């Protein structure tokens, strides 16, 4: 195989299986690899559901690319995959094991016969949207509406928690060279998701000067929402649950921060016109007035950036302005959403579901990272052996503000090139 002469040259033996962190010869594909696998009979907490196994390296179709994973990102869909809740990934792909992981930074290691944009040795980040590419939505519409749309590493069995991962060539984007491998691995899923939520739903796409309420402002999604809102010339009002996170969110560019523990209007909406509803309504108005202290008296938010779901949705639909939008991408506190529909129809508010992003949106978000206009907000890095524990921390909401990464083939933190990794691995 002819390799780019700019790629680092090094000697390494050809083997059927390499230890984690051991580098094969450039472009050489072993028969097997290590992976953190989930099996249906092990569904449960991540520390028991995810076990290291030796599995076959996936074979490529003509438009596929094999990527050597240097580092992988940790997201809540890894917790869902382990638990098998709200659905088991095995109900979709029918494979005997599931490799989770929907974020990664790595090196192109092999390409399918029809791949022309990428070559062996290219350093890339991976966005997690896949589709078959052969329907109207994929060709002139919105690929996220395609019947074949699926999330790599959650709805497919071959995610990033392995030494090699198989992806579609359209999933690849250039890796920001100023970031370390672990920083580059942690941002794509949450950043692209936040980008589509804010800019992908016309005519309610974010505009300069608008106000946006951001739940979970110190987390992976929220930290990018705050930065994107600030970059767009709009105003972010962040919501936190721990006072220690206030300065972190302000430093990201928030106009103001609210601590939800100062209010008592969370959970499912009480039945309207009951004493319980009256108590809820008083607290919800108190929360709304706290927003006014940031935006100005009587100025409600143009958009609510929702992802907790059940615990916050009644308030989200209440505080959005007339003609405003509540955009939601998840339900981390529960899926049974309730709200007072009177404030929805009388004030003509929009409820908008949002799911990841298509390539153009993911690429636009990645460009901001390439241009150093965003911070990856990486909070913690875990070793390969501690991957299940990283998911346990996320499940228990014990993780630090920002985004988490796991080292895979990168032997240590702080490395930015293949040469760095080779030197550190000696």
Question: Each PLM stretch: what is its role?
Answer:
Residues 218, 226:
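N-terminal Rossmann NAD(P)H-binding glycine-rich loop of SDR-like oxidoreductase domains
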Residues 193, 220-221, 311:
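Hydrophobic/small residue at the entry helix of a nucleotide-binding pocket
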Residues 56-74, 86-139, 171, 176-178:
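Glycine-rich beta-strand-centered segment in the early N-terminal region that forms part
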Residues 232, 240, 249-250, 269-273, ...:
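Glycine-rich phosphate-binding loop and adjacent beta-alpha segment
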Residues 54, 80, 102, 130-216, ...:
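NAD(P)H dinucleotide-binding glycine-rich loop of Rossmann-like/cofactor-binding domains
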Residues 2-31, 314-317, 359-426:
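C-terminal hydrophobic helical "lid"/dimerization subdomain
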Residues 214, 230-311:
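Adenosine-nucleotide cofactor-binding segment
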């Amino acid at each position: 195989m002819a390799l780019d002469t700019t790629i680092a040259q090094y000697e390494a033996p050809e083997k059927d299986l390499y230890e984690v962190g051991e580098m094969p010869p450039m472009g050489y594909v072993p028969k097997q690899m290590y992976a953190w696998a989930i099996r249906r009979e092990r569904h449960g907490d991540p520390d028991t559901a995810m076990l290291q196994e030796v599995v076959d390296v996936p074979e490529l179709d003509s438009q596929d690319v094999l990527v050597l994973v240097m580092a992988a990102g940790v997201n809540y869909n890894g917790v869902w995959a382990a638990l098998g809740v709200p659905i088991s990934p095995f109900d979709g792909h029918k494979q005997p094991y599931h490799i989770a992981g929907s974020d990664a930074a790595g090196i192109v290691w092999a390409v399918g016969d029809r791949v022309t944009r990428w070559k062996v040795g290219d350093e890339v980040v991976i966005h997690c949207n896949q589709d078959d590419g052969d329907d109207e939505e994929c060709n002139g519409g919105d690929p996220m509406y395609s019947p074949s749309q699926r999330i790599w590493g959650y709805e497919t069995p071959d995610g990033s928690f392995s030494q090699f991962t198989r992806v579609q060539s359209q999933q690849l984007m250039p890796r920001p060279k100023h970031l370390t491998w672990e920083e580059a691995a942690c941002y794509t899923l949450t950043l692209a998701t936040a980008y589509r939520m804010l800019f992908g739903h016309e005519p309610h796409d974010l505009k300069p000067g608008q106000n946006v309420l951001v739940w979970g402002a110190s987390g992976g999604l929220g930290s990018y929402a705050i930065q994107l809102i600030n970059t767009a010339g709009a105003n972010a009002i962040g919501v936190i649950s721990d006072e220690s996170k206030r300065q972190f969110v302000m430093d990201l560019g928030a106009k103001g921060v609210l601590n939800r523990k100062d209010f008592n209007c969370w959970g499912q909406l009480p039945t309207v016109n009951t004493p319980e509803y009256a108590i809820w309504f008083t607290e919800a108005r108190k929360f709304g007035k706290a927003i006014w202290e940031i935006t100005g008296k009587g100025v409600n938010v143009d958009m609510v950036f929702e992802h907790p779901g059940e615990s916050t949705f009644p308030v989200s639909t209440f505080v959005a302005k007339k003609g405003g939008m509540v955009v939601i991408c998840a339900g981390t506190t529960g899926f049974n959403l309730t709200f007072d529909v009177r404030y929805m129809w009388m004030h003509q508010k929009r409820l908008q579901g949002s799911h990841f992003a298509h390539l153009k949106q993911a690429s636009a978000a990645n460009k901001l990272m390439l241009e150093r206009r965003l911070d990856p907000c990486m909070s913690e890095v875990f070793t390969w052996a501690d991957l299940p524990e990283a998911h346990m921390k996320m499940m228990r909401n014990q993780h630090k503000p920002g985004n988490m990464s796991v080292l895979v083939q990168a032997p240590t933190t702080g490395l930015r090139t293949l040469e760095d990794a080779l030197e550190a691995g000696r």
